[in-house]
Amino acid sequence: SLNFTYFSTLFNKRTIYSSSVIVEGSDQHFERVKGMLTGVMVLKGTAKTKMTVGLAVNIDPTAQVPVIPVFTYEHRFDNGLIADVTLPKSVYMRKYLFKNTGRVSLGAEMDQTTFYVYNIDGSNPDQRFQYRQLDINSGIIYEHAIGDFIITGKTGIKLTPSGRLFRKEDNFNDAVFEITPDP
């Protein structure tokens, strides 16, 4: 990807604009170019509390939601706990350990898995498909700094509320195969 960030002031508040051009593909083919534009305004920035609000614009013909509101909030409590909220991505409670070389986090985050599939039925070997699924990962994360490296361990539950296979040139809503959780 290629990224650009610009810092400015809007309504007397620090505002950060960023853009990204992302090239996507697989080990077999280049597949698509997509982009992301964001604008985030810092509403509060103190030693204990940081809060921002903004918009993210997804420039991708297969995007499920082209415009996404963004809200971040971080607060450091007196007991060492940190509330770390990045909506719509994640919600965590964090705590530094061992003289700030370790950190434990409890919470949840949304993630996406995507990959390309080729020659599914053999009738059209040039037809390309994209599989995309939404994952919600809930659990505990431990991170530990050793020199210049950070070792991470995760445990918890992964929920996949939706997954779809669609032709590369089609929209995410035009799925040829769909998975949903079975309650």
Q: Where do the model's predicted regions map?
A:
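Outer-membrane beta-barrel translocator/channel fold
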Residues: 70, 87-173
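Outer-membrane beta-barrel proteins
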Residues: 7, 25-29, 41, 59-61, ...
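Transmembrane beta-strands of outer-membrane beta-barrel proteins
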Residues: 3, 16-22, 52-56, 72, ...
